[in-house]
From Swiss-Prot:
Its EC number is 3.4.19.5. Cleaved into an alpha and beta chain by autocatalysis; this activates the enzyme. The N-terminal residue of the beta subunit is responsible for the nucleophile hydrolase activity. It comes from Lupinus luteus (European yellow lupine). Belongs to the Ntn-hydrolase family. It catalyses: Cleavage of a beta-linked Asp residue from the N-terminus of a polypeptide. It comes from the Eukaryota. One of its GO terms (molecular function) is beta-aspartyl-peptidase activity. GO terms for biological process: proteolysis. This is Isoaspartyl peptidase/L-asparaginase. It is an enzyme of class 3 (hydrolase).
Length: 325
């Protein structure tokens, strides 16, 4: 086995190269801060499952990302958060969705995994379970930012839903019942879904993903993030967290497909991840982060950019948004 490795993302999408520093730097600093937390935890020999939960909790607490505080709003102006976590060693996993008051959805997903015979709890049942477990909750208004209220207003006016990091262009006419991405004003970039994957020096793997979903999504809409095999997956070969257009990720079972290509076709992590992103999903829709049991890292995307960061035990680290080659 190789040494430990970790990767995290803050969402993929049409991130304009002209993204102003005041929009870019807080997200880069957030990734740097969370990467350091993950690195220190791995150096302290914490289990990868604990590491990915810890890192995603920190990402949820940063309002510049679309998870926890700063989650985007439904078409009713409410927050509906979702998350999932998976341990590659045991294949145990937990998922939640429809959360409106839980401060850290990823930790509730972990409790579903550890404290129930189930994998997935949603809406009122998940909220009730959070109360039973003493999970920290807040008034839903605490999770709503002025920026996201404005995003929802723009989305409703344009009759569109919007995924992570959509660039602003003047809205074109929208056909009835058509679903298009919402543009944003001033070249801004939409805050993004967050995720983390990690492997320790013994090859134990884990993955975690958390999001607020789509701007102006229908109440009750569930995306890829809480779906094991779509937005999140881990086994003895690799750990994967996906980001982008949830419906496309679900159709392609993105996270599981990476593992399946490694298992059944003998592909390397990079080969499998690149194939899924560039051959199995439409251009401009999806990105992912992945680590293998040997400590390899892959962070492909077919969008303009993806907020991402990674580090390995041998000292390599990277924080990037756009393609680096």
């Amino acid at each position: 086995m190789g040494g430990w490795s970790i990767a995290l993302h803050g969402g993929a999408g049409d991130i304009p190269f002209s993204l102003p520093p005041e929009r870019r730097k807080p997200r880069e600093e957030g990734l740097r801060h969370c990467l350091q937390i993950g690195v220190e935890a791995l150096k302290a020999q914490k289990p990868p499952l604990d590491v990915v939960e810890l890192v995603v909790r920190e990402l949820e607490n940063i309002e510049h990302f679309n998870a926890g505080i700063g989650s985007v709003l439904t078409n009713s102006g409410t927050v509906e958060m979702e998350a999932s976590i998976m341990d590659g060693n045991t294949m145990k996993c937990g998922a939640v969705s429809g959360l409106s008051t839980v401060l850290n959805p990823i930790s509730l997903a972990r409790l579903v995994m550890d404290k129930t015979p189930h994998i997935y709890l949603a809406f009122q049942g998940a909220q009730d379970f959070a109360k039973q477990q003493g999970v920290e909750t807040v008034d839903s208004s605490h999770l709503i930012t002025a920026e996201n209220v404005e995003r929802l207003k723009l989305a409703i006016e344009a009759n569109r839903v919007q995924v992570d990091y959509s660039q602003y262009n003047y809205p074109e006419p929208v056909k009835d019942d058509a679903e298009k991405e919402l543009p944003l004003t001033n070249g801004d970039s939409q805050i993004g879904t967050v995720g983390c994957v990690a492997v320790d020096s013994h090859g134990n793997l884990a993955s975690a993903t958390s999001t607020g979903g789509l701007v102006n999504k229908m109440v009750g809409r569930i995306g890829d993030t809480p779906l094991i095999g779509a937005g999140t997956y881990a086994n003895e070969l690799c750990a994967v967290s996906a980001t982008g257009k949830g419906e496309e990720i679900i159709r392609a079972t993105v996270a599981r497909d990476v593992a399946a290509l490694m298992e059944f076709k003998g592909l390397s992590l990079k080969e499998a991840a690149d194939f899924v992103i560039h051959e199995r999903t439409p251009k401009g829709t999806v990105g992912l982060i992945a680590v293998s049991a040997a400590g390899e890292i892959a962070m492909p995307f077919n969008t303009t950019g993806m907020f991402r960061a990674c580090a390995t035990e041998d000292g390599y680290s990277e924080i990037a948004i756009w393609p680096t080659t």
